[in-house]
Amino acid sequence: MDFTQPKPATALCGVVSADGKIAYPPGVKEITDKITTDEMIKRLKMVVKTFMDMDQDSEDEKQQYLPLALHLASEFFLRNPNKDVRLLVACCLADIFRIYAPEAPYTSHDKLKDIFLFITRQLKGLEDTKSPQFNRYFYLLENLAWVKSYNICFELEDCNEIFIQLFRTLFSVINNSHNTKVQMHMLDLMSSIIMEGDGVTQELLDSILINLIPAHKNLNKQSFDLAKVLLKRTVQTIEACIANFFNQVLVLGRSSVSDLSEHVFDLIQELFAIDPQLLLSVMPQLEFKLKSNDGEERLAVVRLLAKLFGSKDSDLATQNRPLWQCFLGRFNDIHVPVRLESVKFASHCLMNHPDLAKDLTEYLKVRSHDPEEAIRHDVIVTIITAAKRDLALVNDQLLGFVRERTLDKRWRVRKEAMMGLAQLYKKYCLHGEAGKEAAEKVSWIKDKLLHIYYQNSIDDKLLVEKIFAQYLVPHNLETEERMKCLYYLYASLDPNAVKALNEMWKCQNMLRSHVRELLDLHKQPTSEANCSAMFGKLMTIAKNLPDPGKAQDFVKKFNQVLGDDEKLRSQLELLISPTCSCKQADVCVREIARKLANPKQPTNPFLEMVKFLLERIAPVHIDSEAISALVKLMNKSIEGTADDEEEGVSPDSAIRSGLELLKVLSFTHPTSFHSAETYESLLQCLRMEDDKVAEAAIQIFRNTGHKIETDLPQIRSTLIPILHQKAKRGTPHQAKQAVHCIHAIFSNKEVQLAQIFEPLSRSLNADVPEQLITPLVSLGHISMLAPDQFASPMKSVVANFIVKDLLMNDRSTGEKNGKLWSPDEEVSPEVLAKVYLLRLLVRWLLGMKNNQSKSANSTLRLLSAMLVSEGDLTEQKRISKSDMSRLRLAAGSAIMKLAQEPCYHEIITPEQFQLCALVINDECYQVRQIFAQKLHKALVKLLLPLEYMAIFALCAKDPVKERRAHARQCLLKNISIRREYIKQNPMATEKLLSLLPEYVVPYMIHLLAHDPDFTRSQDVDQLRDIKECLWFMLEVLMTKNENNSHAFMKKMAENIKLTRDAQSPDESKTNEKLYTVCDVALCVINSKSALCNADSPKDPVLPMKFFTQPEKDFCNDKSYISEETRVLLLTGKPKPTGVLGTVNKPLSATGRKPYVRSAGTETGSNINANSELSPSAGSRSREQSSEASETGVSENEENPVRIISVTPVKNIDTVKNKEINSDQSTQGNISSDRGKKRIVTAAGAENIQKPDEKVDESGPPAPSKPRRGRRPKSESQGNATKNDDLNKPVSKGRKRAAGSQESLEAGNAKAPKLQDGAKKAVPAERQIDLQR
């Protein structure tokens, strides 16, 4: 109801009736200050009842009781000390306002103000719902709300004071004991004031908003709810007032307008949650604030908006796209805390608003590479948290970011990424919580986590082991369940992950053996040798723990405890015992940890380190029971009753991988296999048609069957005939394993092997080469394992059959398809037999380990002849190019294998070593690749002499970037291993000449001095080649100047100049080339290091096999390279590179315009020395690079001559597709003969055919092609090319990688069809024949 101003007709203190008295209701006596309070209350109750019963239509009564109404508003009543009196008076006044509406009986504004303030104060009584008077307070509230009595105050100038007091009172008294009616009346009362007034003042708004502040909200939840509903109800009216408030504070910066200014962001959050309409005009102001120059202010706004955008029911991002985009921009804020807050928000957003994931993805991608570790860490937490809630919330791209961070440079980030992925795998793959589709989405995780085991960091390796034990194959599962998990995991891993898992078991087993050896040392009496051995063992163990520096101290302490505590030692012995079960291991670990725990030390780093050690060596997965369970699973797969298909694995794959798994475990846990049941199952596998399965089964018998002969005679009797059959007619791999198995597990092995050797040696038939492979393998391994028994019989086989009948005869004609390499299955049986024959020769010699019969010399001459003849030993031209590549690889590998035996290394001549080295520059990519891998594998195990590491220097000439990168990584690995070995082994100092990496320098210098490409010691281009090869090795050696190594290497080069070449000591040209290479090496060392001028701490020793003893009076201070040449070598100008400088890339057919790419990826083989300082180690698939181009001609084919004009390349960047002027092709003395063959006269190489000639119809006559060798090109190449050859380096002995598939990418030069006139105009055009 609305009130109007009353007529000013009555007095304030009472209008009397006709008789001059105040009229009271019947039965009510006069109410004055003369009566007692109780009496007054009694009379007021009757008055209240009277006014309560009156309505607005009672005009007579209204007039009658008007004096009473005025009397009740007197100061006596308004200030009465008794609260009951005040309550009754307030109820009366509320009814009076109701009865006399719309005209109030009070005319004075001051009196009205006093009355309403009085009524407001009485409303505080609502607080106590248990009060006897609560109903009257409720009546008062109800009356005021229904009548809207407070609206009369709008006419008062200071009505705001009344409203503020009212609002504060109501918000303060509301509590959880009030029912909804109380709340509704309060809302009605307040909302009428807001909605029907002229506006809401800031103070009044503050009285509402203060209840939304978290501190107040937590104190009185009901006042917050009341304010929330009030704001919702009055949103249309109050929104403008709220907008004005935020405008004053946010935009104008007038924080003094309100005490709540410092809480604006909290208020915005609460208001948004209540009703986004309340902030309709505020949001643009936030966009302005997001661009503030104050980082802390931006941070506050970002925190706020993160809550607004991320809240579950918010549609702010779709409703306000500009603000959303502006907010996303803060992901790239310069202020770190802002970026951090943005990333943290993403998690809630992904969970509550999956539709926004697309918008967030790109920003999270950038932040996943943030320079701040904490931000990268939180990106992972964000994505993983959302993924754990529901995998559908994150897309593959987001999971990809986590995948990337598993290789982060910071351990904390890597750990979070790895653990996060592990948790996802366990949740969705192991437990299958979201079905097969989700499991498929994260199936890659298992492979990725295991790949991390390849990282060098011990922390990464330990975490992978922990993840495997807790998430991939949880060790706390029951044995059957655990083995099922492992069985199908192993079957579904990719090859690299399988290798990593195998390596993990191998490392754990190695550490177990170290601990076992340590315990054995404890059993021996104390001595200096014992202490030294124990110290070395402790250092080895410490390297297998995190933070090896600290680990050393802890391991020493643990060793002391072991020495003092025999019971602890016995627990540890039980833990590493081959017979320890998984349950026993768990008990042992807990018992040892309990003994070492210190209750007074909550954080015990010593105990943590010991736990790391125990977790690595404890057999928590595999024991006899586990192996039995695995075998049963495999049997089910064989019988077809397993859940293979359900697990996503085919039965054949499950069987094969199951056997492979058992094979790996047979190395690490051989004792666990010893049971009849297990061996019966393996015998069943031996009878299967799958060759791989049978091979793995034999390997398992070989590794685990040492007690079969004594304990399981039935298994023995069944096994022997099967092994004999496999050795005679199985696959080559089966034959090898069968022979080794017989040798390993049977006591009468001599008899058994003789029963295989004799029939096989008699039945060899060169006319049926496909039936020769397995016999050759068996015979080779038999002669290696039992040389005393079979070395002599083998010699006659070698002389009468192997060399005479097989090697020196070509019975079949190879397919002339022009390819330099073909898949294994396409290799002809005859060539395959020859490859295995060479291996047999090597095994025979390795078994004898002596050269008393001079068989090794003959074999080395044979292998050298094979290399000189490029694989075509008979030189009848009947063998294909790809088969020749196979034989070259086999011959080079054979020499390298023999060099691993000291007695044969001594008789390998420098010429033979150089021939072997040139295989790494073979024209066939696969030959180079496989040879380099074999070389690295032998070097890294310290099996090959140090001189063989010098071969990697030749890889600088490899035209394929991946091969150079691989070679560099091999060098880094080999050098680090040798240095580490010297540090860890005190006795190694006596063998420094064969171990110290720097001692490779003289071998490298000698090898490069005899490089067939190096024919003229003053040719700048050839010297640049030499410099590149030198720097390829020296760059890795000079990374650190350990022990003044730079000066040491310089001293070696200087000392070589005081000697002569032992290979040709009297040839001045040979010695000049040697000294020239020394000068180039000195030039490189001096230019790259300022530390090489210091004196070397010791005089280096030069290998006598390659250098003569320095003569006393000989002084060689001559400089063999001019100052101009020196400058040219050091300027870094790249040598002009041939277009066909790389391997196995498509080339155009003769006369056709080649397919031209938009940009090249790399120049050819002559890359500047500084261009490969840090190459990528990745290797590209050769299948891709061997595909033919659109012209239909591919690498590894015999191609006709290509006449291609080439310009010198100025840098190693990509070469643009430009037509290159033919007259530029002569500017750079291009090494066009990189692909040509050369001659080397090796001992035993006879009947070398004369070079054949080919002339291509599309160009000038090609120079005749000399055979492979170490000498310069033959002078029989014709006068047409002699002058040109003066400016070209001669190619390497093995067809140097030249015409190849990657050459077009390297050069991208077009080859226009030459006309007759062009031939005359350009006499220096280059001819390249891929066959050479």
Swiss-Prot record:
GO cellular component, one term: nucleus
Cross-referenced CDD domains: PDS5
Modified residues (N6-acetyllysine): 1145, 1210, 1288
Biased composition (Polar residues): 1160-1173, 1222-1232
Pfam families assigned: PDS5
Organism phylogeny: Eukaryota, Metazoa, Chordata, Craniata, Vertebrata
Organism this protein belongs to: Mus musculus
Region (Disordered): 1138-1332
Modified residues (Phosphothreonine): 1207
Modified residues (N-acetylmethionine): 1
Residue numbers carrying Phosphoserine: 1096, 1174, 1194, 1303
Record-level GO BP terms: anterior/posterior pattern specification; cell division; heart morphogenesis; lens development in camera-type eye; metanephros development; mitotic sister chromatid cohesion; negative regulation of DNA replication; neuroblast migration
HEAT repeats mapped onto the chain: 392-428
Entry-linked SUPFAM superfamilies: ARM repeat
Gene3D superfamilies: Leucine-rich Repeat Variant
Name of the protein: Sister chromatid cohesion protein PDS5 homolog A
Subunit structure: Interacts with the cohesin complex. Interacts with WAPL (via FGF motifs) or CDCA5 (via the FGF motif); the interaction is direct, cohesin-dependent and competitive. Interacts with SMC3. Interacts with TP63.
Cell compartments where the protein resides: Nucleus
Annotated function: Probable regulator of sister chromatid cohesion in mitosis which may stabilize cohesin complex association with chromatin. May couple sister chromatid cohesion during mitosis to DNA replication. Cohesion ensures that chromosome partitioning is accurate in both meiotic and mitotic cells and plays an important role in DNA repair.
Biased segments, Basic and acidic residues type: 1316-1332
Source taxon at top rank: Eukaryota
Residues making up the signal peptide according to the UniProt record: none
Keyword tags: Acetylation, Cell cycle, Cell division, Mitosis, Nucleus, Phosphoprotein, Repeat
Similarity comment: Belongs to the PDS5 family.
